[in-house]
Curated annotation (Swiss-Prot):
GO terms for cellular component: cytosol. HAMAP family: UPF0246 (MF_00652). One of its GO terms (biological process) is response to hydroperoxide. It comes from the Bacteria. This is UPF0246 protein VS_0505. Belongs to the UPF0246 family.
Length: 258
């Protein structure tokens, strides 16, 4: 079972590291190509392109300038520990064990606009470049065209290496659009998390993002290797709803939160 999640805009390069182990990202040459494009952008360009404040634009122009093709523990940290935000609050990687990190390294992948696809312990320098950014480059007008089949091919490698063909999609639509389902050597299953609000069950973004992280952790901690086992996910009050689920979607619901 392979799990994919989105990255996060919020980053943490200050907190103590939960593990000293690390690996190197695989697509540095591709990332360097994007960095060269980004280095031609002014702060005003970045602000308009990414729809961010002048302050955040300035920060990211500086990040593009400082980015290096050499990744060390001085200029980078493990992706699973660098990303913060709702998904990663649910995942809570800081409290994973060494065995958990081993399992995650083989079974979890993070999609990324700049890095393409990251293993949890891959070193990552700070950046902001969302997959939906319409950044013109030599391969096309956006990052989906830039990455093409590269991400899907690497996911196929990971699926084949672990011996089954199930991919659990815990990523957002923006990021999963970088995967080409027709070229994927596996069955895609997308968990859907619905929370009760005013008597109605619906996807509430904040809760759904956190739930994706909690499910990723559940898979890692329990070494989940079947869809049937995944339906027993019950973290934070979620429960599986078989009658609303199908071969492509697993629906989980939760009662209203006070």
């Amino acid at each position: 079972m392979l799990v994919v999640v989105s990255p996060a805009k919020t980053l943490d390069y200050e907190s103590p590291l939960a593990t000293e182990r690390f690996s190197q990202p695989e697509f540095v040459e591709h990332s360097a190509e994007l960095i060269e494009v980004c280095r031609k952008l002014t702060p005003a360009d970045v602000s308009a392109l990414m729809k961010v404040s002048d302050k955040i634009a300035g920060l990211n122009v500086a990040r593009f300038e400082q980015w290096s093709e050499t990744f060390t523990q001085e200029n980078a940290r493990q992706a699973i520990l660098a990303f913060k935000g709702d998904v990663y609050t649910g995942l809570d990687a800081e409290t994973l064990s060494d065995d958990d990190f081993d399992y995650a390294q083989n079974h979890l992948r993070m999609l990324s606009g700049l890095y393409g696809l990251l293993k949890p312990l891959d070193l990552m320098q700070p950046y902001r470049l969302e997959m939906g950014t319409r950044l013109a480059n030599e391969r096309g007008t956006n990052l989906y065209q830039f990455w093409g089949n590269i991400i899907t091919d690497k996911l196929n490698e990971a699926l084949n290496a672990q011996g089954d063909n199930v991919l659990i999609n815990l990523a957002s639509n923006e990021y999963f659009k970088a995967v080409k389902p027709k070229s994927l050597d596996g069955q895609i299953i997308t968990p859907v998390f619905k929370d009760c609000k005013n008597g109605q069950y619906k996807v509430i973004s904040f809760y759904a993002k956190k739930a994706r992280g909690m499910m990723a952790r559940y898979i890692i901690e329990n070494k989940i290797d079947s869809v049937e086992a995944l339906t027993r996910f019950d973290t934070a009050g979620y429960y599986f709803v078989e009658e609303e689920s199908n071969a492509k979607e697993l629906v989980f619901k939760r009662e209203e939160q006070n």
